Amino acid sequence: MKSLIRPLVVLFVVLNAVTGLAYPAVMTVFGQAVFPSQANGSLIEQNGKVVGSALIGQPFDAPKYFWGRLSATAPMPYNAAGSGGSNLGPLNPSLADQVKARIAALRDAGTDLSKPVPVDLVTASASGLDPEITPAAAAYQVERVAKARNLTPDAVAQLVAANTTGRQFGVLGEPRVNVLKLNLALDAAQAAH
């Protein structure tokens, strides 16, 4: 029995040193050297001040801004510490109520509801933190945002196109629009206008 204790203790110490110290240290140094922005949270700065992250959505509800996906996090929207979906099933009345409330908010903000509403504007993502919407969801909001900002719909649509990211490597994922980046571009365009 005593002959087993020493190898077990040595193995425990070596594995802790490798997996608890060496590997995290090497990955941290590698991340900072090769991908510094991503390793630090993909933070977005404006005028030297951090205004958000490209990875975590933010609540926008003013008519002059594009709106992102709903957040299912509690106790506040887009709470990274509370990441997770609502887990509401398709037949759950609460999900139907949330969808109806979001459609009403879109209508109250002046969005034309004569066209079908893109699903990502009325449902939460699996994480509850999704910072991106589909180009269709952005296009759906162009008229409302243009009217609220006294810009032409074409000018706003051009900003949407400029802020649309295609598929990764041309095949992975779907085209998407980062809502925070688009709204910051809108603010900059209106300031220059």
Swiss-Prot record:
The chain crosses the membrane at residues 7-27. It comes from the Bacteria. Coiled coil: none annotated. Keywords: ATP-binding, Cell inner membrane, Cell membrane, Ion transport, Membrane, Nucleotide-binding, Potassium, Potassium transport, Transmembrane, Transmembrane helix, Transport. Its main location: membrane. It is a single-pass membrane protein. Belongs to the KdpC family. This is Potassium-transporting ATPase KdpC subunit. It comes from Burkholderia cenocepacia (strain HI2424). The lineage of its organism: Bacteria, Pseudomonadati, Pseudomonadota, Betaproteobacteria, Burkholderiales. The gene is kdpC.
